Amino acid sequence: MHKLIYNALATSYGVKLKDNQKIKMNKTQSYDRIAFGYDFIAGLFSFNQINKSQLAFVSHLSTQGTCLILGGGTGYFLQKLLEENKTIHVTYVDASVKMIASAQKRISKKRPSELYRVSFICKHVEDFQFENYDLIVCNYFLDLFDDAYVTLLIERFKQHLKKDGLLYITDFSIPEKGFMHWSTKVGVKILYTLFGWITSLSVQHLPNIKSIVLQNNFVLLESVAFFKGALKCNLYK
């Protein structure tokens, strides 16, 4: 069944996948198991640079009307976006019931008057029905997938971004050389092993996110590195 679903997706987006390139997504993956400690783990691993990196270009997001956030986790970025943009309406998608609950709790506590501007949806991205948006945000989300599925997602983003729409991506990056090149590779490997053990995640290495985005005719507007190049926030149009 999974093979049929993903082959159908690939066909619909013009991508042919060989048997050894099958998109590996296990719908039994449960990020509920890490929801309670997600912010702590993220902060500990990166000395809070993961949270900081997500906000690199939030000041550029003050005029958009509609936004899709995929894999939004516990709602840190969502809170900051609502504070920056006083009129935006956000569709907030996460596969974890507990992550969604944490995000709702955060906004209820920090920005209670803004809850009406957020639609919380608990679904896997392959089950989500896209609409059209001024902004699509993927913070530490695309690293959960292999190149083939990231390609499908980026093509879909292209279809569903409005004219002059923005694509906002923050994720891990391997520095080209030096100590941080090797230490980041080891750190990312440890994270994938940990997440694989907890959630049954099958991906073992970072996808080539930037290359895939640029191949789909997005233009890089802004880019900034954190944690000596191990984390990057990129803003595309």
What are these regions (language model features)?
Residues 2-37:
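N-terminal, positively charged/glycine-rich alpha-helical extensions of SAM-dependent methyltransferases
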Residues 47-64:
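Conserved alpha-helix/loop element of class I SAM-dependent methyltransferases that forms part
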Residues 68-126:
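Class I SAM-dependent methyltransferase SAM/SAH-binding core
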Residues 151-163:
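A short glycine-rich, Lys/Arg-flanked "PGG" loop and its adjoining helix->strand segment in the class I
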Residues 216-219, 223-237:
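Core SAM-dependent methyltransferase catalytic element
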Residues 137:
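A conserved beta-strand element that flanks and buttresses the S-adenosyl-L-methionine
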Residues 64, 161-167:
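Short glycine-dipeptide loop
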Residues 170-216, 223-224:
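C-terminal alpha-helical "lid/dimerization" subdomain adjacent to the S-adenosyl-L-methionine
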